[in-house]
A protein has these predicted regions:
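A short, small-residue-rich loop immediately preceding and capping a beta-strand
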Residues: 65-71, 90
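Short, structured active-site "lid" loops
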Residues: 49-67
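Short, solvent-exposed amphipathic alpha-helices that sit
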Residues: 14-29
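A short beta-strand-loop structural module common to alpha/beta enzyme folds
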Residues: 29-45
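Short Gly/Thr/Asp-enriched flexible loops that form oxyanion-binding sites at enzyme active sites
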Residues: 77-90, 94-97
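Short glycine/serine/threonine-rich phosphate/pyrophosphate-binding segments
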Residues: 14-15, 53, 75-81
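C-terminal binding/interaction regions
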Residues: 4-17, 100-210
């Protein structure tokens, strides 16, 4: 699995801590971490949590990433931004129980975490434990186990509702302020990382018009 890490500007200084915790947990599982930044608070490209949603949607819908880890001060804004787009089901994860139940009950493809609220002494340990529960035990297996059938059924119903209420991603992007879009893909390593992994030629061609 290719796991993308995205940080917005208010918590960009923690990017290295988050990346280290994520890699420590998931690389031994055989997953790959791709860090799209922000890498530091003074990066030239300043991502807002709204732009994290745009970038996450581009990565997931294009196949450039299979999963996205992101967040903001509380995680709430990033979660709302990601869930504004088709092809993205983002949970809000504060602790390992959130991580495990989201993986097995909701079976999404992104999480938003609080990187300021509650992030004190031992914060990196909480990240590691969350990532262990998020990626270490599979997905969509239900919790409690005896609830797996109705939970999987409800997940399929939700997927159907979302398919009916969202329009294709490129149509969504064309309706958004171009400057907001350009800022979302302005990261110093975006082009290098994205085009090497993108599996959707149409979306790749559209993204090139933003650069």
């Amino acid at each position: 699995m290719k796991i993308a890490l995205i940080n917005e500007n208010s918590q960009a200084a923690k990017n290295g801590i988050i990346e280290a915790a994520l890699k420590k947990v998931v690389e031994p599982m055989g997953h790959e971490v791709v860090n799209y930044g922000m890498y530091a608070a003074d990066d030239a490209a300043q991502l807002t949590y709204v732009q994290c949603g745009i970038l996450a949607a581009i990565l997931l819908n294009s196949g450039a990433a299979d999963y996205v880890i992101t967040g903001c001060g509380t995680g709430e804004g990033a979660m709302l931004a990601l869930n504004s787009f088709p092809g993205v089901i983002c949970g809000h994860v504060e602790d390992p129980v959130d991580a495990y139940t989201f993986a097995h009950v909701n079976d999404g493809n992104a999480v938003a975490m609080p990187f300021a609220k509650g992030f004190g002494w031992g914060g990196e340990l909480n990240l590691e434990y969350c990532f262990e529960k998020l990626f270490g035990f599979g997905h969509g297996q239900g919790y409690p186990k005896e609830r797996v059938e109705p939970e999987q059924r409800n997940k399929k119903i939700l997927d159907g509702v979302r398919a009916a209420t969202f329009k294709p991603l490129i149509d969504c992007l064309k309706s958004i302020d171009p400057d907001l879009l350009k800022g979302a893909v302005a990261g110093e390593r975006f082009s290098e990382l994205f085009f090497a992994s993108c599996k959707d030629a149409e979306l790749a061609a559209y993204v090139k018009t933003l650069l």
